[in-house]
Amino acid sequence: MNKPVLDIQDRPTVGQWITLSLQHLFAMFGATILVPYLVGLDPSIALLTSGLGTLAFLLITKWQVPAYLGSSFAYIAPIIAAKTAGGPGAAMIGSFLAGLVYGVVALIIKKAGYRWVMKLLPPVVVGPVIIVIGLGLAGTAVGMAMNGPDGKYSLLHFSVALVTLAATIVCSVLARGMLSLIPVLVGIVVGYLYALAVGLVDLSKVAAAKWFEWPDFLIPFADYPVRVTWEIVMLMVPVAIVTLSEHIGHQLVLSKVVGRDLIQKPGLHRSILGDGTATMISALLGGPPKTTYGENIGVLAITRVYSVYVLAGAAVIAIAFGFVGKITALISSIPTPVMGGVSILLFGIIASSGLRMLIDSRVDFGQTRNLVIASVILVIGIGGAVLKISDSFQITGMALSAIVGVLLNLILPGRPQAAENLFEENQSDHVA
């Protein structure tokens, strides 16, 4: 490992602080605003809560884990379903419960260790569920890319999506250095400029917006009644269980980048609690659930600047951006096909990352056990199976596939042993 330019506890100069913090802001910006755009939440609150959530995460992890938290893609479909079932308030209640699950898991890990998590959620379960999450959103991405405001096919709109997609792909594959970490942002900018040129952008709201504007917060009890239903629980909680594996994966990669076992110190329980707390803070203000971002881990790896103060600086800037009305209006003016073009690649990458998890973990599909578990998860999840227990309680698609996968893994014989030490195992194996 190369010597860090700034280690975890090193303070940068003022000039370094601003420049390096902006790099992290740009790395997370595109994905963080895309999620609220897709689910109908306020992008300014997503930015603000990403900053607040990151600061809470850094505090809970004793300023020892250099990570940035942005909007989680895993919750897109559940949030849309929850909003359909009970409005935005129901989605926020579900998000808060998801964060609460993280808190409970963190407490159990502190008392009993983390091996039980690996037994419950091995790659043969998590990989196919991640594939389901990505492919389950494929129709949404294509619809956004192809259709006009009237819901009918539009070649003009599709051309905007294709230009956006092409720019994102070129940046992802050919760009080097910092530019390679912001393909989503580059794609959105290029697509936006093309949409502006062909007349699909209305800048009147940007011109009319104030520079300082209070975000449209969504506060429990004040803006919506707090009512927990089984339907909301079963929409959101299974996703939280699955995204635990994503969190652990990010901590392993981050440990490898900074050359320290973050699983042991400050401890996996602290990082999970930090992630859950960030999600709960976001839910209380009307933002989407949070997760640590691989893009920002990439920034750490390229710059070799691991300072938590740089991440905190990015968080403060994100909070400030949440109150800039012009930025919110500019985000809102992005045409749907621009986001559709980006989403085609992003949702495909989510699905492919599930496949990559299976490959990296060397899951043997020559074993009937693994083949059965993965096959059932994929068909139930992508097929949209629904277990309707009553008129007010049903378990749908992705959540049902995750639950079935966990149960099959526990019931079927031949379950492999979980690793004793995740960090040591992944020092010799390739993890990304």
From Swiss-Prot:
Record Pfam families: Xan_ur_permease
Location(s) in or outside the cell: Cell membrane
GO cellular component annotations of the record: plasma membrane
GO molecular function per UniProt: xanthine transmembrane transporter activity
Membrane topology annotation: Multi-pass membrane protein
Superkingdom, taxonomy of origin: Bacteria
Keywords, sorted A to Z: Cell membrane, Membrane, Transmembrane, Transmembrane helix, Transport
Ranges that cross the membrane: 25-45, 65-85, 89-109, 124-144, 155-175, 181-201, 206-226, 228-248, 305-325, 330-350, 370-390, 393-413
InterPro entries associated with the record: NCS2 (IPR006043), Xan_ur_permease (IPR006042)
Role description: Transport of uracil in the cell.
Protein name: Uracil permease
UniProt gene name: pyrP
